[in-house]
A protein has these predicted regions:
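Bacterial N-terminal signal peptides
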Residues: 7-16
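Positively charged n-region of N-terminal signal peptides that target proteins for export
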Residues: 1-7
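Non-catalytic cap/lid and distal C-terminal segments of serine-dependent acyl enzymes
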Residues: 21-269
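Short, intrinsically disordered, low-complexity terminal segments
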Residues: 2, 18-19
Length: 269
């Protein structure tokens, strides 16, 4: 075979690989409720023979829309391999609440309504709860469960990795007082805005749930308590504990298991 022919084959293979790569783009999604544009990183497979299943990934405190790609650089490969659409919104340091203290911070409304509408309008998704999952790390773990528990008509599966699933033991941390006021003066708000107290709002079968946390994580105890309350309420869920602390290497590993869990849910629905 001539060198010219080999060169041609190489070029064809190269372009076939490129055309099958997932696309990564950052879009600005306008939030009517907050009257501003929100950056959102979207990882979409190049080809899909069926409507895309969507996984919403929420970042932690101090992060932004690029955080998940920084932790998991091969997210585009996973999107292409599994035919998944990953949506990573910028949640600022909001804890993904509609803040009762700051009317300009309405990230629950943004993620659960405005962003969903944008994604289902602009991408070939399955526009039903059976086609959507949501998860996140740390602050985003709390946010994902908070939103899913309160919008079971929108999401079919939800997860949390190292999530701050009970905020009350940490009243001085992560600017939560900007959203809720101080714990001392706003005990009822803190009680009603911690996701462990939202468990009573769901029933078994409303959501496919997966929760994980590392043994060395400062959120380990509250995750154990969260798991215990789910058991007490007879809510089926996967609960995974493994060696690890509150950092990127832990989440780089844990997200693989969550994606596998969501894939199984999508395949069954």
């Amino acid at each position: 075979m001539s060198m010219k022919a080999l060169h041609l084959i190489f070029i064809c293979l190269f372009f076939s690989i490129v055309t099958e790569a997932a696309t990564v783009e950052t879009v600005k999604v306008f939030s009517k409720s907050m009257n501003k544009e929100i950056p959102v990183v979207i990882v979409a497979p190049e080809k899909s023979e069926k409507p895309l299943r969507t996984v919403y990934l929420l970042h932690g405190y101090g992060g932004n829309a690029n955080m998940w790609l920084g932790i998991k650089p091969n997210l585009p490969d996973i999107a292409e391999r599994d035919g998944l659409l990953f949506v990573c919104p910028d949640g600022h340091n909001s804890w993904y609440w509609d803040s009762p203290k700051d009317p300009s911070s309405r990230y629950e409304t943004f993620v659960s309504q405005e962003l969903i509408e944008y994604i289902d309008t602009h991408y070939p998704t399955l526009p039903a709860k059976e086609g959507r999952a949501i998860t996140g790390l740390s602050m985003g773990g709390h946010g994902a469960l908070w939103i899913a528990f309160r919008h079971t008509e929108t999401f079919g599966a939800a997860g949390s990795s190292s999530g701050g699933v009970d905020i009350r033991p940490f009243p001085k941390n992560w600017e939560m007082d900007k959203q809720l006021g101080s714990l001392e003066e706003n005990r009822e708000l803190w009680d009603s805005h911690t996701v462990i107290n939202q468990i009573d709002k769901i029933k078994n079968g409303d959501l496919a749930l997966i929760v994980d946390c590392g043994y060395g994580d400062f959120f380990f105890e509250v995750n154990n308590n969260f798991h215990a309350k789910l058991l007490e309420n007879a809510i089926n869920h996967d609960y995974i504990v493994r060696p690890g602390v509150h950092n990127g290497p832990y989440w780089k590993n844990s997200i693989d298991y969550q994606i596998l869990f969501f894939l199984k849910y999508f395949q069954m629905n």
